[in-house]
């Protein structure tokens, strides 16, 4: 999306770079770096960083509008920094703070007596950063000074109303990345953007079970369509190899979801596991008896109520926190869970989730 926006909407090319935890000013602006000379002796030269290299591509000869250059019919070049908050980005781009306002940047040179020179930043130059705030344990925080230089746009996960369309695009991209293979057991309805009715029934069932599992997981951690695509790639390969359908789904979910769920609280992993096995009400009935368990499961209980669309959920959440849900309330919850939650026979995936919760 970050690449397509400049291309499609504004007709700009984009250089994409992935930030890492060891990024410094040299990676963004540049600096003096050693290299081997023609005589195999070490010499020092200027090596520009990703932002400076992108800005330089906008100029053909000198500064000013007459010096602007079009590249492959694009109006200019922007910079995309992927995984923006994987780096200590304030330290790496700190020198840019003033430059982004003044539209001039001081860059190092190898000219005698001139350590720095000014590089003009085009008025239409932009930096786009992509970041994921979910994995807070491994991310750097962004300062207020940095945030004031950027406009923030939240891209949420697809809604459940977009189910068929999300499945369609995830499967289409999964098949595209496995090009060269004939997956004759699945067909796509290009017109209506969904899985075609001619798809092999047992494979179609796996496709929807995988989506329903991810949809449940999204109550506890927002995972995007890229994860669904990876799951579908595993399904396609497993089906092509004529493996047992249940094992294919089980392995696909375990391979792609477990690593995403390792950091979740014990209560949430156990709630996901019990929901997939059709045992969620029994789990909550057991946990409500213990004051300690009761407190740790209130949040998971509320998220499941949201998922099944229970009206007046605050009454149920309040009663659960007090350890006092009536029999008729349990019966209503059991009916709704049976209607809204998909029971999936994934022994390995459910067991690993259970182990994560212990």
Language-model regions, residue ranges each:
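C-terminal regulatory/interaction module of P-loop NTP-utilizing enzymes
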Residues: 1-358
